[in-house]
Curated annotation (Swiss-Prot):
Substrate binds at residues 139-146. Dual specificity phosphatase able to dephosphorylate phosphotyrosine, phosphoserine and phosphothreonine residues, with a preference for phosphotyrosine as a substrate. Coiled coil: none annotated. Residues 46-195 form the Tyrosine-protein phosphatase domain. The gene is dusp29. It comes from Tetraodon nigroviridis (Spotted green pufferfish). Its EC number is 3.1.3.16, 3.1.3.48. GO terms for biological process: negative regulation of MAPK cascade; protein dephosphorylation. It is an enzyme of class 3 (hydrolase). It catalyses: O-phospho-L-tyrosyl-[protein] + H2O = L-tyrosyl-[protein] + phosphate; O-phospho-L-seryl-[protein] + H2O = L-seryl-[protein] + phosphate; O-phospho-L-threonyl-[protein] + H2O = L-threonyl-[protein] + phosphate. This is Dual specificity phosphatase 29. It is found in: Cytoplasm; Nucleus. The active site is at 140 (phosphocysteine intermediate).
Length: 211
């Protein structure tokens, strides 16, 4: 699995069809952004279950240990670790609650390279959910941009969802809105994953290699 997003020379605002035999097209960034403004509106709440075993929540959710216990949370991924406009918790905050903690210092800015955390965050979630009774809270300050971006990347990398399917899966269950720069990075990840799958398909025994 790719550990990050490769640099792309493609225009991020145009659609890309990686596999000529597939109907799927990676949308341009603006079209991807429109997915968050179409369909039924989901009211904002502090925390939502968006995938089996995965909750996305906000700072309030992350700080309330009794509430985490009620949800059965065993792992916390803080996508807003740090002191400045972030959620200041850490592993020690959850030690008495027997909750495993992982934090990343991500800024909710379009220029921030959040893709550097795609692989380690996905690995943390994957390992947490390897035990059937575990539940993961992925949070930032509002639970809309940084945390949502990492969950979307996890679904794409570990469950082979396209960026479109991942967005639809999560936005139907929580009010999310990754910033424009994060969407560009998710789009680049989508293209990278599509290219990897196309390469694997062409290298599979009995498959004709296209030139």
């Amino acid at each position: 699995m790719s550990s990050g997003v490769k640099s792309k020379s493609r225009n991020p605002y145009t659609a890309v069809r990686v596999d000529p035999d597939s109907d799927y097209v990676t949308p341009g960034t603006l079209d991807l952004e429109q997915l968050f403004w179409t369909g039924p509106e989901v009211q904002y709440t502090h925390v939502n279950l968006v995938w089996p075993g995965i909750y996305i929540g906000d700072e309030k959710t992350a700080l309330e240990l009794p509430g985490l216990r009620d949800l059965g949370i065993t792992h916390v991924l803080n996508a807003a670790e740090g002191k400045w406009n972030n959620v200041l918790t850490g592993a020690g905050y959850y030690s008495d609650a027997n909750i495993c903690y992982y934090g990343v210092e991500a800024d909710d800015k379009p220029t921030f390279n959040i893709s550097q955390f795609f692989q380690p965050a996905a690995q943390f979630i994957h390992e947490a959910l390897s035990q059937p009774h575990n539940n993961v809270l992925v949070h930032c300050v509002m639970g809309r941009s940084r945390s949502a971006t990492l969950v979307l990347a996890y679904l794409m990398m570990r469950h082979s969802l396209s960026v479109v399917d991942a967005v639809e899966q999560v936005r139907q269950r929580r009010c999310i809105l990754p910033n424009h720069g994060f969407l560009k990075q998710l789009r680049a990840l989508d293209i990278t994953l599509q290219e990897e799958r196309l390469r694997q398909k062409r290298e599979a025994p009995g498959q004709e290699k296209h030139t």
